[in-house]
């Protein structure tokens, strides 16, 4: 009865070709659109290693004055990353739910990430619930700061959420804030990616069933092993929030990710989100998920 919730995204296991970049982000968007794994955010910023236009060093042999009037006169394009996007499908047979999610994110100045996520949760025979998420993430400490290999990336983030249909007594709008640390360990026989953080939330079942009037602190974590240059596998955990009269189940998943190339990633997972018919907590049962992610 191994109910490892293989959540949606194979979390940050970028292949070895990505490990050399200081601010390199995992090319994945979680269910709420944030750069991260299925349930959890990562400290890395979305697609921070890419830019629309790279800064070009001045050529001392050229004496022509710089051209004016261009969109990049102020170096804007050299500070904006290209976007990344992800699409999710989650099937939870025990609770008869089909969960679809689309998300996109980009970063500025290798310091700030902005994201948007759209979710549609369709219970069999019931009304489809739609949810919108607007996120931002600030990189407080870059990974390996000062050439110290033991320093993880640390980020502070927030997600503004809106749900179309919520139960009586809950709010339609909520806000989550989190602090997360992420570290890629390359000194082991196989590279290991570890991530963990604290979440302050008023979301019931991530906001699908509305937002409580009070906040609770929970924690989350991820561990991924890079098995091959283009293959990773890992485990994800998210603690459920316990509100008065409402206890969310803990979420878990076991996942595998195939980095098809440096732009395209395919993820598959088995997910366990508590007992679907439990009496002590609100769970969604187990199921499977597949997702496809693309980084420009």
Where do the protein language model's features map onto the residues?
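Outer membrane beta-barrel transmembrane domains
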Residues: 208-213, 217-296
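C-terminal segment of classical bacterial N-terminal signal peptides
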Residues: 14-22
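Transmembrane beta-barrel domains of Gram-negative outer membranes and organellar outer membranes
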Residues: 24-188, 199-204, 227-231, 243, ...
């Amino acid at each position: 009865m191994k109910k490892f919730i293989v959540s949606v995204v194979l979390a940050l296991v970028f292949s070895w070709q990505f490990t050399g970049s200081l601010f390199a982000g995992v090319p994945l968007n979680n269910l709420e659109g944030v750069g991260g794994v299925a349930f959890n955010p990562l400290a890395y910023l979305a697609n921070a290693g890419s830019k629309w236009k790279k800064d070009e060093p001045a050529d001392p042999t050229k004496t022509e004055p710089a051209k004016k009037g261009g969109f990049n006169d102020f170096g804007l394009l050299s500070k904006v990353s290209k976007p990344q996007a992800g699409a999710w499908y989650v099937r939870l047979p025990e609770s008869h739910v089909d969960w679809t999610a689309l998300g996109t994110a980009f970063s500025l100045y290798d310091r700030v990430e902005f994201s948007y996520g759209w979710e549609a949760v369709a219970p069999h025979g019931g009304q489809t619930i739609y949810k919108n998420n607007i996120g931002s993430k600030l990189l407080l400490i870059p990974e390996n700061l000062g050439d110290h290999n033991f320093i993880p990336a640390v980020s502070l983030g927030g997600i503004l959420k809106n749900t179309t249909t919520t139960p009586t007594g809950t709010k339609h709008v909520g806000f989550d804030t989190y602090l997360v640390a992420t570290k890629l360990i390359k000194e082991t026989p196989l590279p290991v990616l570890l991530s963990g953080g604290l979440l302050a939330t008023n979301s019931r079942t991530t906001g699908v069933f509305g937002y409580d009037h009070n906040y609770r602190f929970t924690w989350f974590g991820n561990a991924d092993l890079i098995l091959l240059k283009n293959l990773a596998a890992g485990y994800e955990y998210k603690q459920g929030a316990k509100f008065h009269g409402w206890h969310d189940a803990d979420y878990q998943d076991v996942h595998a990710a195939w980095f098809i190339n440096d732009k395209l990633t395919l993820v598959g997972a088995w997910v366990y989100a508590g007992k679907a018919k439990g009496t002590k907590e609100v769970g969604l049962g187990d199921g499977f998920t597949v997702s496809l992610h693309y980084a420009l």
